[in-house]
UniProtKB/Swiss-Prot annotation:
Region (G2), start-end ranges: 60-64
Region annotated G1, chain positions: 19-26
Keyword match Magnesium: yes
One term under GO cellular component: mitochondrion
Residue numbers spanned by region G4: 136-139
Chain's gene name: tufA
GO molecular function: GTP binding; GTPase activity; translation elongation factor activity
Residues annotated to bind Mg(2+): T26
Main location: plastid
Identification of the protein by name: Elongation factor Tu, chloroplastic
Annotated source species: Ostreococcus tauri
Catalysed reaction, written as an equation: GTP + H2O = GDP + phosphate + H(+)
Alphabetically ordered keywords of this record: Chloroplast, Elongation factor, GTP-binding, Hydrolase, Magnesium, Metal-binding, Nucleotide-binding, Plastid, Protein biosynthesis
Length: 409
C-alpha cells in the first residue's frame, strides 16, 4: 500500500497530555481525537487504541508513548500520551517527543496530586513553554465552590513553578462523558452536547493560547561535526546533520568546542555528491571551510552562526538514571562519579559534583531508576545551551539521560 503524502497546509504544533495517574489523560486524548474528527478533522482514536502504546527507544532508553494526530480549523497537531509515570519522566528528559505546549489534566475531584506537581516541575525544567489546564471529572463534583478551590490551587501551583498561573486557560469538563457522547454520535456538532462542547472549548484555547513554534529553519544555524576530511587544494570538509537554521556559501561561521573558538568561511556545501548554495535544518551535508586545517576540527565540535552558542564546562541538569532492567547500572553512584557525557556526536568525560533533590536538599547517592538534578563539570569545554539533551554512558552502555536546566560556567 502506498504511503499517504503528508499535506503540509496548516502550521504544525507538538503537544502532549501531562498530569497525575488516573486523572484522565488517555480518556481526554481519545475524546480530543474524536471531537476533532466530528468537526471534520482526521479519524478519531478509541481509548484502547491509544492505551496500547508501542515501545520506542530514545538515547538507548525504552519508552512507551502513544502518538496521535488531529487537526483543528487552524492547525495540525501531533499529540503524545504516555501510559505510565516513568514513561513521562523518560520522555520529557530525553525529548523523545518534543512538546511545544502541554495540556495538564487535573481531576476536579482530587485537585493537584504529587505527580501533577512533578510534571509541572519537569515541564519547567525541560522547557515546555506553555500549559493549558483541563479540569476533568467535573460531573463528579457536586459543589461548584469545590471546583473553584481546585481551580485556584492549580493556578497557585503553576505560579509557584514560574508559569503564568493567572493567565493560563483552565477549562472544566468530563473527558469520559464527552467520549461516551462522541462514541454514540461521532458526527456531533457544536452546541449539541454540553460535555463535547467543553472539549471544543479546550481545543479553541489550545489553538489561541499555545503559540505556533518557530520553525527549525528560522532558528540560528547549528551543526554538530560528525566527520572531517581534507580535499587537496580545496580545504577541509566537516560533515554532519544541520540541527537547525540555514547556512549559505560565503557565510562566516564559528567552530566551537575543546579549544578556543575559531571563525571560518564556508566556501562550499555538498550533499549526495551535488553542490548546494544553501543548506537547511535536517540536511546531511559536507561543509567546505577556508583557512582551517584538518587538525583544527574534530568530531564533537559544532559549527554555528557567530555569537549564538558558547563553550562551557559546568552545568546543572535534570537526569533520569536507568534501572538495571533497562540496561543501566546495578548499583548506586555517588558525587565524584566520572562517566562519559554523550552530547550530540561525541563522548566527553565529566565529573558529577553533587545531586540535588526536588526539595532542594543535597542528596548523597543516586539509585538506578531515580530522577535527580545534578551539577556536572566536563573536562573539556563544549557548546552547551539550556534544553540541550545528552546521555550518560559508562563502558559503552547508557546509564542515564539528561537535559541541561542551567549553565554555571
Amino acid at each position: 500500500m502506498a504511503r499517504e503524502k503528508f499535506e503540509r497546509t496548516k502550521p504544525h504544533v507538538n503537544i502532549g497530555t501531562i498530569g497525575h495517574v488516573d486523572h484522565g489523560k488517555t480518556t481526554l486524548t481519545a475524546a480530543i481525537t474524536m471531537a476533532m474528527a466530528a468537526r471534520g478533522g482526521s479519524a478519531g482514536k478509541k481509548y484502547d487504541e491509544i492505551d496500547s502504546s508501542p515501545e520506542e527507544k530514545a538515547r538507548g532508553i525504552t519508552i512507551n508513548t502513544a502518538h496521535v494526530e488531529y487537526e483543528t480549523a487552524t492547525r495540525h497537531y501531533a499529540h503524545v500520551d504516555c501510559p505510565g509515570h516513568a514513561d513521562y519522566v523518560k520522555n520529557m528528559i530525553t525529548g523523545a517527543a518534543q512538546m511545544d505546549g502541554a495540556i495538564l489534566v487535573v481531576s476536579g475531584a482530587d485537585g493537584p496530586m504529587p505527580q501533577t506537581k512533578e510534571h509541572i516541575l519537569l515541564a519547567k525544567q525541560v522547557g515546555v513553554p506553555n500549559i493549558v489546564v483541563f479540569l476533568n471529572k467535573e460531573d463528579q463534583v457536586d459543589d461548584e465552590e469545590l471546583l473553584e478551590l481546585v481551580d485556584m490551587e492549580i493556578r497557585e501551583t503553576l505560579s509557584s513553578y514560574d508559569f503564568p498561573g493567572d493567565e493560563i486557560p483552565v477549562i472544566a469538563g468530563s473527558a469520559l462523558l464527552a467520549l461516551e457522547a462522541l462514541s454514540s454520535n461521532p458526527k456531533i456538532g457544536d452546541g449539541e452536547d454540553k460535555w463535547v462542547d467543553k472539549i471544543f472549548s479546550l481545543m479553541d484555547n489550545v489553538d489561541s493560547y499555545i503559540p505556533t513554534p518557530a520553525r527549525e529553519t528560522d532558528k540560528t544555524f547549528l551543526m554538530a561535526v560528525e566527520d572531517v576530511f581534507s580535499i587537496t587544494g580545496r580545504g577541509t570538509v566537516a560533515t554532519g546533520r544541520v540541527e537547525r537554521g540555514t547556512v549559505k556559501v560565503g557565510a562566516s561561521i564559528e567552530i566551537i568546542g575543546y579549544v578556543d573558538t575559531r571563525v571560518a568561511t564556508v566556501t562550499g556545501l555538498e550533499m549526495f555528491q551535488k553542490t548546494l548554495e544553501e543548506s537547511v535544518a535536517g540536511d546531511n551535508v559536507g561543509v567546505l571551510l577556508r583557512g582551517i586545517q584538518k587538525e583544527d576540527i574534530e568530531r564533537g565540535m559544532v559549527l554555528a552562526q557567530p555569537g549564538t552558542i558558547t563553550p562551557h564546562t559546568k552545568f546543572e541538569a535534570q537526569v533520569y538514571v536507568l534501572k538495571k532492567e533497562e540496561g543501566g547500572r546495578h548499583t548506586p553512584f555517588f558525587p565524584g562519579y566520572r562517566p562519559q557525557f554523550y552530547v550530540r556526536t561525541t563522548d566527553v568525560t565529566g565529573k558529577i559534583e553533587s545531586f540535588i533533590s526536588d526539595e532542594g536538599d543535597e542528596a548523597t547517592m543516586v539509585m538506578p531508576g531515580d530522577r535527580v538534578k545534578m551539577v556536572v563539570e566536563l573536562i573539556q569545554p563544549i557548546a552547551i545551551e539550556n534544553g540541550m539533551r545528552f546521555a550518560i554512558r559508562e563502558g559503552g552502555r547508557t546509564v542515564g539521560a539528561g537535559v541541561v536546566s542551567s549553565i554555571l560556567k
